[in-house]
Amino acid sequence: MRKGIIAGTLAACCVLFLAPLANAEPSGPLKWKQFSRTISDVHPVFTTHSGKHVGLMWLDPSVLAFRLIPGTTAPEKSPVRGIDNRPSTWVPKLVAAFNSGFLLKDNPGGYYYNDRVVKSMVDGMATMVLTKAGGFDVIVWHKDDRISDDVLAIRQNWEPLVVHGEDQSNANDSWYRWGGTDGNSPLANRSAVGVTADGAIVYAVCAKCVAHDLGIALVKAHVKTAMILDMNKSWPNGFYYSAPKKHGKQPVGHRVADGQWRTPGEYLYRGTKDIIVADAKAPTPAPEPAPAQ
């Protein structure tokens, strides 16, 4: 069942959120590895590789809450909430984290955060939507879409990479087709994120690849809609984290793929660019027993 999330103050709309998974696992031709960490007996993270270049991380939103943390310099002119400056609000329950999009000046798309439109949304752009309750979706923005009160962040970044389960890229695309590369090279470090038909979030990252490599991998992961994220040498980075062994200690991070420039510890703090973090949801309390008859 799909649930509308965008409406409200600006008009009626058609942007929809998928219901969270019910303890599902990845499907498709790829061989996924189950991460040992569990939340309420559910494995929230699976990883795999596609081809020589692309690392993939599959995330279960039924036990994870997603949040955008604005960077100190990007997105440019972003509002900042007090909790965004406090890693203690996301690090203790951190399960996974990954990079967000381009600088706004390098990106035709829009940006919304904490009740403020920083840059207007653009029709047809690939769009991340995050709710105040921790929901996450990737959609294609339509001109009649409007923002409801339960939405915290909307981040557009380029045209969609995958639409209706079909890769929109081509192996022969120009070096600038999916964003400008260092040295105008067709090969670059790249990243992307998408959602499957049942609501799983799949992050993809690669070193020295073309966008088509990401598109092919995400389609193999049964992603229905996907968008390009940040690119070039140091920006594409995705991690998953083991729970701290002792109270007060930091979680231990693991790279999604080889060739990532940054270390897992860098997402334990607010950096210069925005990131997406996935925290473990609080366990659902057991129902009260029915009174004796």
Where are these regions (language model features)?
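Positively charged n-region of N-terminal signal peptides that target proteins for export
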Residues: 1-4
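Bacterial N-terminal signal peptides
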Residues: 8-19
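Short Pro/Gly-enriched beta-strand edge/turn motifs at strand-loop
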Residues: 37-42, 108-112, 171-179, 257-259
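Histidine/lysine/aspartate-rich catalytic loop segments that bind and position anionic ligands
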Residues: 155-184, 190
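Active-site-adjacent helix-turn-beta-strand microarchitecture at beta-sheet edges
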Residues: 98-168
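Zymogen propeptides
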Residues: 22-120
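Extracytoplasmic/secreted cell-surface and envelope-processing proteins
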Residues: 106-109, 138-139, 147, 171, ...
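Extended C-terminal subregions enriched in glycine
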Residues: 163-164, 182-287
